[in-house]
Amino acid sequence: MNIVILGTQWGDEGKGKIVDMLTEDVAAVVRFQGGHNAGHTLIIDGEKTILRLIPSGILREGVLCLIGNGVVLSPPALMEEIEELNAKGIPVTERLRISSACNLLLPYHVALDKAREAELGTKAIGTTGRGIGPAYEDKVARRGIRAMDLLHPDQLLEKIKKATAYHNIQLEHYYHQTPLDYQSIYNQLMEFREKIKPMIGDVSALLGNLRRQNKHIIFEGAQGSLLDIDLGTYPYVTSSNTTAGSAATGSGFGPLYFDRVLGITKAYVTRVGAGPFPTELTNEEGKKMAKRGNEFGSVTGRPRRCGWFDVISMRRTIQINSLTGIVLTKLDVLDEFAKIHLCTAYRCDGEVVNEPPFDQSLLESCEPVYEEMPGWQTSTYGLTDYSEMPKEARNYISRLEELLGVPITIISTGPDRKHTIVRQAVFNQVITAKG
């Protein structure tokens, strides 16, 4: 069985934990888009691990981890992550494979990203400043440096020389930044070359072989669907396609071979950086939500904006991803709220609507229409049995399923992989739950 697991909001939904939990039964986990701007936090027996590029399956012995062609790969970030895992006694290089078609993220991408955000000032998009957007620009413009170029040092030098000269024009003459030295960039890449070279291969072929052997494969998304470059809240989006279609194009795996698409969603909503957020809470409730959820970015440390669950945006996410199941995370964050609110419609220009406005600029002025439900005001932290869930919490989950039309198959009640209620088996899960 081949399953896509992705975020349904603006990222930070808890995908890493769910992927890690499900990898007990899989042969491989694939990253298919994004770069080291994504942080997947895993907590196992109290020990925290943050992964940015390497798939979450790396913490399971014997699971093959693949980085697909849709990822933009920073060599120094990758090596730093490998070293961090090795220091914890986790071997990486034997189980990690990188698509030869994967584009590399280089110093001029980072320099451009930071210069552009500084130029925009108060109108900045709110990128992580890690060069993701400029790296994807080079890919589309066909001047990108790919992993396979590391196999041909002479050609690599010429490509870097040309790309650096091109970007230096912007850096020096438009942004008034110090130009970069192509030789230094090349020398740095050559330092990483010998370590990365053995991991470069044909990821599409590997996936094809696993499929023919009827092995289970997870395709692990980064960020969230509302940050998709085409379908998200543009221009406040990331630079890759974060939706289910990207699992095929970003890995070289045929779309008809996917069996399920699981969408990860928090029991509330968060967002980092600028952009419309209809259910955002800027009051004490929002602060309480952020504090209880420890809502700070795992990569940037930036505080996340918090708000009530948005049924309207979630329905759109279900449609564009063809979700077959929903994983509800961080339910325990709502334990102390006397009242729970669900946004079931928007009020835009005085009119109540049940779909996001096609004109994204109108979303900024849309107000949420709420349905109120009683809270449970008792701890759900660490529960593993659905029958032990407070009645009000079960009612909340049932109402979500009714409004969304998709079953909630897994509920996360805490950060550890064991803090989980599995209502419907994904593969052959050993963990089971009543309800």
Curated annotation (Swiss-Prot):
GO terms for biological process: 'de novo' AMP biosynthetic process; IMP metabolic process. Keywords: Cytoplasm, GTP-binding, Ligase, Magnesium, Metal-binding, Nucleotide-binding, Purine biosynthesis. It is found in: Cytoplasm. The keyword Oxidoreductase does not apply. It catalyses: IMP + L-aspartate + GTP = N(6)-(1,2-dicarboxyethyl)-AMP + GDP + phosphate + 2 H(+). Binds 1 Mg(2+) ion per subunit. It is an enzyme of class 6 (ligase). Its main location: cytoplasm. One of its GO terms (cellular component) is cytoplasm. IMP binds at D12, E13, G14, K15, N37, A38, G39, H40, T128, R142, Q223, T238, R302. Mg(2+) binds at D12, G39. Its EC number is 6.3.4.4. Pfam families: Adenylsucc_synt. Its cofactor is Mg(2+). GTP binds at residues 11-17, 39-41, 304, 330-332, 412-414. The active site is at D12, H40. Signal peptide: none annotated. Pathway: Purine metabolism; AMP biosynthesis via de novo pathway; AMP from IMP: step 1/2. Substrate binds at S298, V299, T300, G301, R302, P303, R304. GO terms for molecular function: adenylosuccinate synthase activity; GTP binding; magnesium ion binding. Homodimer. Plays an important role in the de novo pathway of purine nucleotide biosynthesis. Catalyzes the first committed step in the biosynthesis of AMP from IMP. NCBIfam families: PRK01117.1 (NF002223), purA (TIGR00184). Belongs to the adenylosuccinate synthetase family. This is Adenylosuccinate synthetase. The gene is purA.
